[in-house]
UniProtKB/Swiss-Prot annotation:
InterPro entries: Complex_I_Subunit_2, NADH_UbQ_OxRdtase_chain2, ND/Mrp_TM. Its EC number is 7.1.1.2. Core subunit of the mitochondrial membrane respiratory chain NADH dehydrogenase (Complex I) that is believed to belong to the minimal assembly required for catalysis. Complex I functions in the transfer of electrons from NADH to the respiratory chain. The immediate electron acceptor for the enzyme is believed to be ubiquinone. It is a multi-pass membrane protein. It comes from Lampetra fluviatilis. The gene is MT-ND2. Belongs to the complex I subunit 2 family. It catalyses: a ubiquinone + NADH + 5 H(+)(in) = a ubiquinol + NAD(+) + 4 H(+)(out). Keywords: Electron transport, Membrane, Mitochondrion, Mitochondrion inner membrane, NAD, Respiratory chain, Translocase, Transmembrane, Transmembrane helix, Transport, Ubiquinone. It holds the Pfam family Proton_antipo_M. It is found in: Mitochondrion inner membrane. It comes from the Eukaryota. This is NADH-ubiquinone oxidoreductase chain 2.
Length: 347
């Protein structure tokens, strides 16, 4: 295990890497920020010294190295072609397509998604939360910047495939971390489909996804639920079980919960772009994700053993105000969608 000082230093380094990518105006600085992120999370992934975590760390390092190498080569070609390192869409479609593929690979989007479920399965829930949320922000920033002049079909195709792969891959899974990994793939599809059209909606959906996923991971960690079967064995923390049910339905995009906001904003934007058939296929793919979320809720609540009044139930739990705030936003933020959009458009 890592000491608190080293762990705090690594977490601050993670934040530094993301901020470097956010504030960079050249490809070389953006690449450095991505590498700082990768180097900082590797000790966090391998801190348990378990063979599964070491295997997951190795797979993650190889996958991210391949994506970073591709991005660096294409950035060098773009700089040679344009004469500067500025982050701007290249006039060469081959270079632009290679950059997009490299960023999709780092995000774990289909068809370059194979590393993400295996890596997530070997991590603890806390590190998995960082991998599924914070590590997505820097690549999404770069993808938004180059997607405006990208061929829409080159982004919309992998986005649709990610929605179907994320829904289909999660059907036969029993580990909660793998289920969240496939959920992440599906959500990345919805987020990427907005990047060529509306950066504001893309960022709103990204932040909502990070909020929902973080809250779900924290709740699963509270219940010590690494597998679906563990959801039926917790007799004493019924409040967390009820909250987990609502969080899972929100992740599935069931109205009127917060997760429906992402589907609604994306649907309106795609309809405005006259992509009705594409939107219909995205909706059909999201039903697969909703199915396995509903299955988890079924196992969590309906199949739980009876809890008579003689059981020692932890109704008087220790107050946790940050967790309460995150859960409330993850469930009830949908009603504040107009105000949220107004704030993002203003700033």
């Amino acid at each position: 295990m890592l000491s608190p000082l080293i762990q705090s230093t690594l977490l601050m380094t993670l934040g530094l890497g993301t901020l470097v990518t956010f504030s960079s105006t050249s490809w070389i600085l953006a690449w450095i920020g991505l590498e700082i992120n990768t180097i900082a999370i590797i000790p966090l992934m391998a801190k348990t010294h378990h063979p599964r975590s070491i295997e997951a760390t190795t797979k993650y390092f190889i996958a991210q190295s391949a994506g970073s190498a591709t991005l660096l080569v294409t950035a060098c070609l773009a700089a040679w072609h344009s004469g500067n390192w500025a982050i701007s869409p290249s006039s060469d479609p081959i270079i632009l397509n290679a950059m997009t593929l490299a960023l999709m690979f780092k995000l774990g989007m289909a068809p370059m998604h194979f590393w993400l479920p295996e890596v997530m399965a070997g991590l603890d829930l806390t590190t998995g939360m960082i991998l599924a949320t914070w590590q997505k922000l820097a690549p999404i920033t770069l993808l938004i910047q180059i997607a405006q002049d990208q061929n829409n079909a080159f982004i919309l195709g992998p986005a649709l495939l990610s929605v179907f792969v994320g829904g289909w891959g999660g059907l036969n899974q029993t580990q909660t971390r793998k289920i969240i990994a496939y959920s992440s793939i599906a959500h990345m599809g919805w987020i990427a489909s907005m990047a060529p059209f509306n950066p504001t909606i893309t960022w709103v959906t990204t932040l909502i996804y990070c909020l929902l996923t973080s809250t779900t991971f924290i709740n699963l960690n509270t219940l010590k639920a690494n597998k679906i079967t563990a959801l039926t064995m917790n007799k004493h923390n019924q409040i967390s079980q009820m909250l987990l049910l609502l969080l899972l339905l929100s992740l599935g995009g069931l109205p009127p919960l917060t997760g429906f906001t992402n589907k609604l904003l994306a649907s309106v934007e795609l309809a405005n772009q006259n992509l009705v058939i594409y939107l219909f296929m995205m909706m059909m793919g999201s039903l697969l994700s909703l199915f396995f979320y509903t299955r988890m809720c079924y196992l969590s609540i309906i199949l739980s053993p009876p809890c008579p009044t003689t059981n020692l139930t932890l109704w008087r739990v220790t107050p946790n105000k940050p967790m309460a705030l995150m859960t409330m936003l993850s469930i009830n933020l949908f009603i504040l969608t107009p105000q949220l959009m107004a704030i993002f458009i203003m700033y």
